[in-house]
Amino acid sequence: MKKSAILTLSMGFLLLFAWHIQAIDTPEAREHATKIRALALSHATVNNIEIAYKVIGEDDHPAVLLIMGLGASHILWGDNLVMQLVDAGYRIVLFDNRDTGDSQRLEEFGQPLLWWQLLKARFGFDVDADYTLEDMAQDSVALLDELDIEQAHIVGASMGGMIAQAVASNHPSRVLSLVSIMSTPGFGDHLPPPSTEANDQLTNMAKDKVDNKARLRQLGIYTESMPRQIMAVIKSGDRTEA
């Protein structure tokens, strides 16, 4: 396991966060910024986990399951994207992954010692994780079962793209299409890294917009779950051949 594991996740998070900041920082977005938040949350126990979710759109329209990334809740998808999909004739399923947002939090597991787990992975030893991407993919499919949705377009961003890949690999009959956004099937060969200038711009954008944990929560970001979810990614390994 290379240090690129953390680099990939970190860059994915920064891109995800920058995308969200840009999505909400327009007059149109501000005008409609409460649409998703205003919808009542539903809860269902699926795969032995309580999942918080929302469904927008007509029951007979093709379903789109949106899977968010590392430590992030469903609100980061933003009203503009979601409402454009609804207006285009899709039924949108939004939900919070296990251990983040309003879904069941798994704080009883505590925080992994990341440096130790990464060191173990670096030298080929098995790492410890409280759950895997496959578990999170099963949560997604179980939610579709709960909603009586036989098939859906599966869309994931960052770590959500990894979960979406696992859904497509393990449950191909449930997938109409797969959209994996700013994600990766594993930690092997990579595209060239971003320039220092681009990386600094993303980092500074995040620093400028966020000054404390309460603000992060308002934006739908839950830092407490990130170490456990990073371990889920590392534990799950590579999906390139899948």
Question: Across the structure, where does each feature detected by a protein language model lie?
Answer:
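Conserved acidic catalytic loop of the alpha/beta-hydrolase fold
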Residues: 121-152
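Conserved serine/cysteine hydrolase catalytic core
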Residues: 235-242
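Short beta-strand immediately N-terminal to the catalytic nucleophile in serine-hydrolase-like folds
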Residues: 136, 154-156, 181
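Flexible "cap/lid" loop of the alpha/beta hydrolase fold
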Residues: 162-169, 178-207
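Conserved alpha/beta-hydrolase "nucleophile elbow" surrounding the catalytic nucleophile
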Residues: 68, 152, 156-158
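Residue in the alpha/beta-hydrolase core beta-strand immediately N-terminal to the catalytic nucleophile
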Residues: 96, 153, 177-179
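Conserved HGGG/HGGXW glycine-rich cap/lid loop of the alpha/beta-hydrolase fold
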Residues: 46-119
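N-terminal cap/lid segment of alpha/beta-hydrolase-fold proteins
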Residues: 29-50
